[in-house]
Amino acid sequence: MIKEELIMKAKAVRLHGANDLRLEEFELPEITDDEILVKVVSDSICMSTYKCAILGTEHKRVHEDVAEHPAIMGHEFAGDIVKVGKNHQHQFKAGMKFTLQPALNYKGTMWSPGYSYEFFGGDTTYCIIPAEVMELGCLLEYKGKAYYEASLAEPMSCSIGAFNAAYHTQMVPTFSLAISL
């Protein structure tokens, strides 16, 4: 019996270098036993994404060979799990909604989705979540109704952290900000 391999295509905004973003369709490799294939439903855009697009390899999270292995942009995203590698089937199932914690800091590296990975980022139709995300506990089941709320969790935590830091360092804010969901 011949095993039929599914060819998975994705369309994504990918970084090829400084000021070089391209909307491209490409094939995703088959996932390994330690990876998870997801469909992205919602992705937020961050100021650090803009800085990454302008700086290219000068950005601390962008790998040096991005021209040969373009990185999928976007790190604040949520969606649906499509396929689960056998080593994670005890915890994750196809059809489950997800969000993630993008600040991985895996083994001291600065790599994170949206800057560093060829097949892992939020500005895409589908992506492959690598093993280190599950190893770090950064892939999270999402039980909310609206995907956009999950993709806004990281920016909201940054805003709350900034106000908390300002309070504890006695910085005097010179502006007002209202956040509502």
Predicted regions and their residues:
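Short, Lys/Arg-enriched N-terminal segments with co-localized hydrophobic residues
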Residues: M1-I7
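Extreme N-terminal starter segment of soluble prokaryotic enzymes
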Residues: K9-K11
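Extracellular beta-rich ligand/substrate-recognition surface
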Residues: V13-L21
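Glycine-rich beta-strand-centered segment in the early N-terminal region that forms part
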Residues: P29-D43, E58-L104, F120-G121, L140
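Short cysteine clusters
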Residues: C46
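Short Gly/aromatic-enriched secondary-structure transition segments
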Residues: K51-H59
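NAD(P)H dinucleotide-binding glycine-rich loop of Rossmann-like/cofactor-binding domains
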Residues: A103-A178
